[in-house]
Every structure is written in C-alpha cells, then in structure tokens.
Amino acid sequence: MLQLKLFAVLLTCLLLLGQVNSSPVPEVSSAKRSRRMTPFWRGVSLRPIGASCRDDSECITRLCRKRRCSLSVAQE
C-alpha cells in the first residue's frame, strides 16, 4: 500500500512538473504600433468636409488642406 501511495505522489509531481515546463512564453511586443481600427471602421469614421484633420486618409474626400477636410484640391 505504501508503494502505491509513493507511486501516486511521484506521478503527480511529474505531471505538475510537466505543466510548469509547458507553460506559454510571453510574447515580446513589437516596437512598431499597428493601426487599431479595421478597414470597416476607418471607412465609417471618415470626417465630413470642414472637419479638422491631420492626414488625407481621415477625410471622406481624401483631401486634408490646412488641417481641414476639403472638397477641392486647390483652395483660394
């Protein structure tokens, strides 16, 4: 009976040791930050004409001039 208990304890220790060794390794985060919005949400969230912008991709007309969404390429 003592041998059976000793075998059970040894087997349990081996199983627990295997679980510790197979635990996942944390991933290293990349230095470059990726865009968070999917293409669907980028399309839905485009800014109207006259809204403030930083980039052509933010405007519904794809024209950001003088930090405002523009309708035409050349403004007076």
Swiss-Prot record:
Gene Ontology, cellular component aspect: extracellular region
Keywords: Antibiotic, Antimicrobial, Cleavage on pair of basic residues, Disulfide bond, Secreted, Signal
Propeptide cleavage-removed residue intervals: 23-36
Entry annotated with the keyword Plastid: no
Leader peptide range in chain numbering: 1-22
Localization: Secreted
Disulfide bond entries: C53-C64, C59-C69
Domain of life of the native organism: Eukaryota
Presence of the UniProt keyword RNA-binding in the record: no
Pfam families: LEAP-2 (PF07359)
Function: Has an antimicrobial activity.
Homology family: Belongs to the LEAP2 family.
Protein name: Liver-expressed antimicrobial peptide 2
